[in-house]
Amino acid sequence: MRIFIGIDLDPEVRARIERFLEGVESFAPDARWVRPESLHITLKFIGEQSPDRVEAISERLRRVESGAFEIRSGGYGFFPTAKAPRVFWIGIHAGPQFAELAASIDMAVAELGIPREDRPFSPHLTLARAGGRSGSPKWRKGDAPNATFAVLEKRLAAMGELDFGTMTAHEFILYQSQLSPGGSKYTKLQRFPMRPPANTAE
């Protein structure tokens, strides 16, 4: 099965993003837009694994320790570059705990021979993809310009700063991803709770 590790959005943040999408999807009608219910923050993509390997990965993930932390979603950008946009995303902003969690997960599954990440952790929410080649930053060199997001870029520039609110990340999740013509379907296989934030009340 095809798996990855991520963080789900809370309902309020998801609803704000859904309302935003309803207002901007028409500005890039040729793009493949992500369904709001499928939005998530990816911590580590793993790919195809056997059921036995999935269980071994789950066992490693149970050993990962992290406290809950705040995440703010806002701002936007395009991969691989604004001149050759193939992915439209909104930013995810958090303290060092977020990157530390991603690094801990990366190290935990590396014990099973899963390749380590070769680029810095850059959390984001993918909202839409253009057709053709991957929008991965690895395509940065030699990627051809395209006009899929041209109108959207102009509209976004006129909107000012995007802010979809703040949420608390209190767990990370092992997902299964099933590909289909209508878009990927994500199933939550297992949840891994994080320590609650320290109580600062007197």
Give the residues covered by each predicted segment:
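Histidine-dependent nucleotide/RNA phosphoesterase domain, centered on the 2H-phosphoesterase fold
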Residues: 1-202
